[in-house]
């Protein structure tokens, strides 16, 4: 049977869409999400002070993303509406990261299957529990695939190098400053060389940092900026040789 000109099998279409999405995501700077003694820490390489990769979603839930900003921003705002509606109609305790992750998985899966162009995004939805054992971190990819991660995850460009560093240095129950240093060192390991082909140095001005702190009252999400971020970085800065 002769195939019409320009025909591509379903398998080829899936491969092409996947390659397209992965290339777009790989161009984005990485984001790390990891647990620390009092909650969950979000760290992104992001020099912009207005275009956030990390956001608060609900009482105990945070969001991080890489890829095309307008696409993951659309998902973020839609997620907030979903959770606000669910909390209003039922109970705030019914709003969970798992429910949000499932909604995102359905949306991304439908877009990947039905649209010519998939979303070029990778997302993390995290929820801080009342204890460390209750913390939840979900990773979602462009095709709607969802994974339940434990301890840490990295998304975006060079994520494999970043994950290798996290596996070596992250441990459960680390203090906030130590977890931040682990995240920054991991992002540095995944960053391309600097102008002189040397190791890049990530400073507070290159970072977007936030946390979900289970010890806080009411709003558990807090951005770490300014002198607080500088102090945490200085606390674990490598000694000059």
UniProtKB/Swiss-Prot annotation:
Activity regulation (UniProt): The formation of the proteasomal ATPase ARC-20S proteasome complex, likely via the docking of the C-termini of ARC into the intersubunit pockets in the alpha-rings, may trigger opening of the gate for substrate entry. Interconversion between the open-gate and close-gate conformations leads to a dynamic regulation of the 20S proteasome proteolysis activity.
Keyword list, A-Z: Cytoplasm, Proteasome
Gene Ontology MF terms in the entry: threonine-type endopeptidase activity
Keyword hit for Metal-binding: no
Gene Ontology biological process: modification-dependent protein catabolic process; proteasomal protein catabolic process
Pathway: Protein degradation; proteasomal Pup-dependent pathway
Quaternary structure annotation from Swiss-Prot or TrEMBL: The 20S proteasome core is composed of 14 alpha and 14 beta subunits that assemble into four stacked heptameric rings, resulting in a barrel-shaped structure. The two inner rings, each composed of seven catalytic beta subunits, are sandwiched by two outer rings, each composed of seven alpha subunits. The catalytic chamber with the active sites is on the inside of the barrel. Has a gated structure, the ends of the cylinder being occluded by the N-termini of the alpha-subunits. Is capped by the proteasome-associated ATPase, ARC.
Annotated protein name in UniProt: Proteasome subunit alpha
Gene: prcA
């Amino acid at each position: 049977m002769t195939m019409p000109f320009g025909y591509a099998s379903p398998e080829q279409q899936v491969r092409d869409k996947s390659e397209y999405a992965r290339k777009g995501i790989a161009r984005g700077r990485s984001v790390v999400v990891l647990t620390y003694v009092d909650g969950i820490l979000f760290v992104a390489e992001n020099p912009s002070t207005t275009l956030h990769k990390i956001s608060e979603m609900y009482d105990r839930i945070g969001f991080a993303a890489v890829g095309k900003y307008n696409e993951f921003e659309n998902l973020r705002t839609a997620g907030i509406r979903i959770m606000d509606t669910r909390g209003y109609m039922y109970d705030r305790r019914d709003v969970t990261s798992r429910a949000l992750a499932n909604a995102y998985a359905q949306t991304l899966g439908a877009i990947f299957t039905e649209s010519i162009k998939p979303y070029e995004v990778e997302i993390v939805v995290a929820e801080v529990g009342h204890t460390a054992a209750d913390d939840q971190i979900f990773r979602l990819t462009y095709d709607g695939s969802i994974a339940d991660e434990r301890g840490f995850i990295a998304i975006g460009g060079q994520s494999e190098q970043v994950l290798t560093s996290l596996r070596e240095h992250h441990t459960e129950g680390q203090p906030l400053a130590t977890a931040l240093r682990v995240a920054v060192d991991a992002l540095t390991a995944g960053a391309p060389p600097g102008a002189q082909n040397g190791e890049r140095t990530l400073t507070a001005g290159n970072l977007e940092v936030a946390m979900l702190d289970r010890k806080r009252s009411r709003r558990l999400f807090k951005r770490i900026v300014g002198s607080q971020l500088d102090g945490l970085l200085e606390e674990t800065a490598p000694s000059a040789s």
